[in-house]
Amino acid sequence: MARSIKKGPFVDGHLLKKVEAVRGSNDKRPIKTWSRRSTVLPDFIGLTIAVHNGRQHVPVFVTENMVGHKLGEFSLTRTFKGHVADKKAKK
């Protein structure tokens, strides 16, 4: 189910404070966060946010197309190694 419009998008408070601090100081370092559940807001455009994927922080540069999506969508948690080909099919 989608989130109610009257509630508005969810963003963790600590992440919002970090974004406001970076906007004021003009700092170019990525913002580290573990909050994969936070929604990307228009205030985040142009910032690099390092989103944790369970093992490391993946840098994500926020663009206009990402607004409204969750940060976790851009930091993959599973590595796909590929399917193994059938040995019988090769012959």
UniProtKB/Swiss-Prot annotation:
Top-level taxon of origin: Bacteria
Keyword Magnesium: no
Gene Ontology process terms (BP): ribosomal small subunit assembly; translation
GO cellular component: cytoplasm; small ribosomal subunit
Cited InterPro entries: Ribosomal_uS19, Ribosomal_uS19_bac-type, Ribosomal_uS19_CS, Ribosomal_uS19_SF
Molecular-function GO terms, alphabetical: rRNA binding; structural constituent of ribosome
PROSITE patterns: RIBOSOMAL_S19 (PS00323)
Pfam families tied to this protein: Ribosomal_S19
Keywords: Ribonucleoprotein, Ribosomal protein, RNA-binding, rRNA-binding
Role, per record: Protein S19 forms a complex with S13 that binds strongly to the 16S ribosomal RNA.
Protein family: Belongs to the universal ribosomal protein uS19 family.
Protein name (record): Small ribosomal subunit protein uS19
Gene (UniProt): rpsS
